[in-house]
Structures are given as C-alpha cells and as structure tokens.
Curated annotation (Swiss-Prot):
Cross-referenced InterPro entries: B3_DNA-bd, DNA-bd_pseudobarrel_sf, REM16-like
Gene3D superfamilies, per the entry: DNA-binding pseudobarrel domain
Source organism per UniProt: Oryza sativa subsp. japonica (Rice)
Transmembrane segments: none
Protein name: B3 domain-containing protein LOC_Os12g40090
One term under GO cellular component: nucleus
Length: 334
C-alpha cells in the first residue's frame, strides 16, 4: 500500500490525554519503519513531534502527545482525522483535523501558539511587499510545536495619528499564548477625529498619506468605531481566520461569541458571520460563513478592508468598505 495514501481517525475516549493507539492495519504498514515518531501538523499550521511506543501489540502515540492534547484542548468524544503527507528517515508526517462532539471543526485549534518562538516581518508598503526577512528562534524540545511563520493571529492594534498627541506605552502579548511581552507606543488625543480607528499589525504599516487617501474614498458615519485590515493570505484561504484587534473588541464587542451582520455599501445582500470570543486575547471571524463572505465579495490578498461598526443598529452590524490598488493608486471596490 502507498504510505502517502494512508488516512485514519481516532475518537478521543478513555485515557486519550496520555496517549492514543494507531489502528492495527496502519501500524502493520509502518512496522519497523517508524523509529523517530510522528510529525503532526495541526490546524494552526504548527508541527508537533510525537514519539511512538509499542505496548503489547499496539503502536501508541506517547511522548509529546500529552502536550499536543493540552495545547489543542482535546476533550472526550473529540474526533481527530489523520492524513499522511510524507514519510522517511524513521518518521512520518500527518495533517491533523480536529472536530468536537457536534461534528464541527474546533475553532480553538487555530490559535495554538509556541511560547519560545518569535517572528519579525518588515514591509515597505501596502500590498505585502516584503522589505526584510523572517527571524525565528526555536526550542530544542521536540515535543512542542515548531515555530509558526506567518501566523494569522500575531496582531497588534494602533490608532491613527493626527493633531496633538501624547504617548502612552502599554503592554500587549505578541502572541495569545506567549509569555514574552513587548511595549507598543500608542497615541491618544482628545481632538483626533479618528480616535476610534484601530489597525491590525499589517495595516499599521500604512503611511499617513496612504491612510488619508484610503479614508478619502469612503463615507464613514461620525462616531462609529472602525478597524482596518490589510488582507493577508491567511485571511482569505479556507480554514483560516481574521483576528479583530484586541482593543477594538474589548471596547466595542460583547465578551462572548455571537453573530455579526456584515453589509457592503450600496448592496442589498447581507452576510451573518460568527464572531468567536475564545479568550482575553483571541477574537475573530472563522467559519464557512466568513469564507462565504470572502468568496462572494471576491476579496484578495492586499485588499484594505475598513470595518465600520454601526451604532444604533438593532443587532451587531458592520459595514465593510473594500479598497484595492490599480496603477499604484487606491480605488474603492464595489
């Protein structure tokens, strides 16, 4: 049998938190070939090394499995689906999908992060043109996930600057699960007409001139809170997420998961998407309804999306203004 075609699932029952067995037929295929363990790629994109042990006649995922189970908050009756994506040198790699007891993919599994890793990415302009390079450090502990490059949830917030300002340093985690903190210089002003405007990390690289050009293209109601996103690959691909800036969510959204209605200017169609509130640092859109919004509005990497929370609406509603670039100029997309 072609090893690369192997797929199997395991239902989390019994003492699953400390180890799970590999199906007998799968274990027979790998007999004598797996000496270094399995590499498990989780929905977050991270890869975990998990050792194998033979107990009686069973092949058990053991060393490192407990860490994997804790990080992904595995519970009784969760279902894990394993798909082989390569093998060799005494190990085998699997993509792992994780479903809860209701049959839905577990959203929390998109947010696992590694504490001993960091990344740095420099941009020279809007549209994802990379000016620098990635920097990463990784622990030698193979039972923990590898460094995650390009994580969609490493985001920070900032406010647009104008008028007379003062600087207030505040601390914010670079990663929802990271023990390392950094200081963000945040500008505050009483006479700033954009005081309620927040920017995700990549949107924060927009220059003042670019921001002025972008906001000149849209009509925003005074007093409505706003956050700005520059779409990355992670936002528009299936099974990925869009993180809502932490400060915006804390100030303007309920501290629980709920539906939010998305509308586009001058269009009758409406989209109800799920807003997930998972912890004090992780909030965002992720589900098939968000993917439907992306697809039906033909959103692309590099688009600038301005999310305007409509005050006074009967239910949580955001108007989404989309800006693209043509001939090196920003244009409003219908």
């Amino acid at each position: 049998m072609d090893v690369s075609r192997i797929r199997f699932f395991r239902l989390m029952t019994g003492d699953f938190a400390h180890g799970i067995s590999i199906p007998e037929k799968v274990a027979e295929i790998f007999s004598g070939q797996i000496t270094k363990g399995f590499n498990l790629k989780s929905p977050s994109g991270e890869t975990w090394r998990v050792g194998v042990a033979k107990v009686a006649d069973e092949l058990i995922l053991k060393s490192g499995w407990e860490d994997f189970a804790k990080a992904h908050e595995l519970q009784e009756n969760d279902l894990l689906f394993f798909t082989c994506n390569g093998h060799g040198n005494g190990s085998c790699s699997f993509d792992v999908l994780i479903f809860d007891a209701s049959g839905c993919e577990k959203v929390s599994c998109f947010f696992t992060g590694k504490k001993n890793s960091y990344m740095c990415k420099n941009f020279n302009s809007i549209g994802g043109q990379v000016a620098g390079q990635y920097l990463s450090s990784d622990s030698e502990d193979t039972s923990t996930p590898s460094v995650l490059i390009g994580s969609p949830h490493k985001a920070s917030t900032s406010k647009k600057l104008s008028g007379k300002t003062k600087t207030n340093p505040r601390k914010e985690p670079e990663d929802p699960n990271c023990s390392h903190w950094h200081v963000i210089e945040e500008k505050n002003t009483d006479d700033d007409e954009h005081a309620d405007y927040h920017y995700t990390r990549f949107a924060n690289y927009l220059t003042g001139e670019e921001r002025d050009e972008i906001f000149s293209l849209v009509s925003l109601q005074p007093g409505n809170p706003v956050f700005v996103v520059v779409l990355q690959t992670a936002h528009v691909r299936r099974r990925n997420i869009l993180i809502v800036p932490t400060r915006f969510a804390a100030d303007h959204l309920e501290r629980k998961s709920h539906d939010i209605l998305l509308i586009r200017p001058n269009r009758k169609q409406k989209w109800s998407v799920k807003y997930y509130y998972l912890s004090n640092t992780t909030r965002g859109f992720n589900c098939h309804r968000w993917i439907k919004f992306i697809r039906e509005n033909r959103l692309r990497e590099g688009n600038v999306c301005i999310f305007e929370l409509m005050k006074g609406a009967r239910r949580p509603t955001m108007t989404v203004h989309v800006i693209g670039k043509a001939d090196n100029r920003f244009v409003l997309l219908g």
